[in-house]
Amino acid sequence: MDIARLKQLAGIGENPHFIQMPNPRKEFALRHHERMKLSMNESKPEKLELKKLAYETKDLAPVLSKENVEYHYNILSNGYVTRYNNKEGDPDFNYGGAMLHNLFWEQLQKADGSKPEGAIKELIEDKFGDLNSFVDEMIKTAMTIQGSGWVYLSKSGELKTTPNQSYKTDILMPIDMWEHSFTDYIPAKDAKGKYIKAMMTIVDWNQINMRMGK
């Protein structure tokens, strides 16, 4: 959406009556215009990049199959970046998809039995008691998603959801809850719960600690 259209929606575009507006109305329209600018994130970069995986696509099995990772990363994740860079479709949707997937893939590793340590361990214990309770609460939160979206641990230690590909600046650890993410667990009765529990075994907790330090 260009600035001219933005001004029109805000009521301050090519409006012959704007000049005659009483000052309070002018100020309100200008403030509304500024809020809309902020909500549109005009500071978005011109181009985005899909971060390279720090592991092979087979390394996340059996939590995520090689076929799942290759489709999810090479086709879907790459698609958000490509469409954003080519200015195709909804820029906010594609920007969010690219940002969320970069965080998602970056925080995974080959299962090695590691547990949360350092700052993330302290945060989990402070907010949830222990890792198992944290996972249980994440599953409960994920089950509130209507349609497609993500469940995530926020930087403040809260469990939240975000719809579709809506990127939030408070995201610390996102888990993709679109159906294509947990196809390896369908048709299990509790596919989402099994998927989230399994995902916790391939989280690179050091990566989460690095994010907390930023």
What are the roles of these predicted feature ranges?
Residues E42-K214:
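Feature for soluble, non-membrane regions of globular proteins
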Residues M1-K44:
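Intrinsically disordered, compositionally biased, charge-dense segments
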